[in-house]
A protein has these predicted regions:
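Amphipathic, small/basic residue-rich leader segments at the start of a protein or domain
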Residues: 1-63, 73, 79-90, 94, ...
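Conserved active-site and cofactor/substrate-binding residues in soluble primary-metabolism enzymes
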Residues: 12, 43, 66, 79, ...
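Short coil/turn connectors at secondary-structure junctions
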Residues: 24, 55-58, 90-94, 118-120, ...
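FAD-binding core of FAD-dependent oxidoreductases
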Residues: 60-69, 92-98, 128-140, 157
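Flexible, glycine-rich active-site loops centered on histidine and acidic residues
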Residues: 70-75, 97, 109
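A structural signal for short hydrophobic beta-strand segments in well-ordered beta-sheet cores
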Residues: 113-116
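A short core secondary-structure module
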Residues: 121, 125-171
Length: 171
């Protein structure tokens, strides 16, 4: 897939490519018009994706616009939609995914990273691994255990965290 060709491109090239697609209205063919997408039909999206693949075009950075944005569109507050979606489109913010953990791998029911509600913020303690583009990302969306007493398939929350917050580090 096109996303696999992203690893050799420098961040600046990704940003230029994403901007060029966004300027044409082609960055997120599956987004609804109300959030900045073109409102294309399934057939139009298929033709676009096929042509991009046929021409060996680079993929886009999927974590923000393809993975996190749909969650924000469906479950986010109006403030979150206004704050994050335009910056995802513009490429101003880069995102990474924080799911896998040491000892749990991709078994999300075994997430051990803990989040405690502090009223105006969450205090998060734990470690994520295999986090592609963490070294380039401005934000991470992560699955965090927020209810220690809940059964293991429950009590997990989807948190958005600023990678520049104190205590966040990449190795």
């Amino acid at each position: 897939m096109a996303e696999n060709r992203n690893s050799y491109l420098p961040k600046e090239d990704h940003e230029r490519w994403q901007k060029a697609l966004n300027d044409k209205g082609w960055l997120v063919p599956d987004w609804p018009v109300e959030f900045g997408g073109p409102g294309w039909s399934t057939t139009q999206k298929y033709i676009f994706d096929t042509e991009m693949a046929n021409h060996n075009a680079p993929g886009i950075m999927p974590f923000g616009v393809r993975m996190c944005a749909p969650v924000i569109m469906k479950f986010g507050s109006d403030e979150q939609k206004q704050r994050f979606l335009p910056r995802m489109l513009s490429g101003e913010d880069w995102w990474c995914q924080g799911y896998s953990e040491p000892g749990a791998g991709s078994d999300l029911a075994n997430v051990q990273t803990i989040g405690e509600d502090q009223g105006d913020h969450w205090l998060v303690n734990g470690q994520k691994i295999w986090t592609s583009y963490a070294d380039k990302a401005d934000w991470i969306f992560a699955l965090i255990r927020t209810d220690r007493d809940a059964p293991k398939h429950k009590g997990i929350s989807f948190l958005l965290m600023d990678m520049s917050d104190p205590g966040v580090e990449t190795r």
